[in-house]
Amino acid sequence: MAVISMKQLLEAGVHFGHQTRRWNPKMARYIFTERNGIYIIDLQKTVKKVEEAYNFVRELAQDGGKILFVGTKKQAQESVKEEAERTGHYFINQRWLGGTLTNFTTIKKRTARLAELKRMENDGTFAVLPKKEVIVLRKEMDRLEKFLGGIAHMDKLPDALFVIDPRKERIAVAEARKLGIPIVAIVDTNCDPDEIDYVIPGNDDAIRAVKLLTAKMADALLEGNQGTEQQATTTA
């Protein structure tokens, strides 16, 4: 059975690309036609590419790999958080802080600080500190939670990235490429597919399209995790 159907893709509007004047010629091979000044993505190719990405993600999870979901545009924020939490993987849905991957030791210090502040809140330390100091600490904690909460438990670099709109997330893409971390991405008609290891040609601006494709990658992770559990049972 196919991982995803043409009907699902059509209903979610995955086939709608950008205006013809805003395009990357490298995406030509994934474009079916042009309609009313908008490029229409070839969904037969999308079906095939979703399957390739799904298989990669499933096998990665089966090997115990972890994925970092990245989507900071408004249309992606909720799906990225939901699906990462559903699968127990990581996410960044606010702003990509430069050096998140390439300067990971510094990022780890910030997530350690977040953990420390949460501990202080939970163990009653805040209750005995001066009110003004607590206000400052809470502000710091909220800011760290906002930008780094989704990677608070990421103690090593991720094994792959799932990116929504690699053009917007170009810093994340550049960092992953520099470190040789594979990238799976929803790539619209205005993006450069050559920077992506597993291209999913599709609409990165419609909430339904983003939700469908992000959920599909999350399903692949869950299926892969089941395989890991089965292997562990067999070994035991």
Curated annotation (Swiss-Prot):
InterPro entries, alphabetized: Ribosomal_uS2, Ribosomal_uS2_bac/mit/plastid, Ribosomal_uS2_CS, Ribosomal_uS2_flav_dom_sf
Keyword terms of this UniProt record: Ribonucleoprotein, Ribosomal protein
Keyword Calcium (UniProt): no
Gene: rpsB
GO molecular function, one term: structural constituent of ribosome
GO cellular component terms, A-Z: cytosolic small ribosomal subunit
Organism: Brevibacillus brevis (strain 47 / JCM 6285 / NBRC 100599)
Keyword Ribosomal protein among record annotations: yes
GO BP, one annotated term: translation
Protein name: Small ribosomal subunit protein uS2
HAMAP family reported in the protein's UniProt record: Ribosomal_uS2_B
SUPFAM superfamilies noted in UniProt: Ribosomal protein S2
Pfam families named in the record: Ribosomal_S2
Domain of life, source organism: Bacteria
Family: Belongs to the universal ribosomal protein uS2 family.
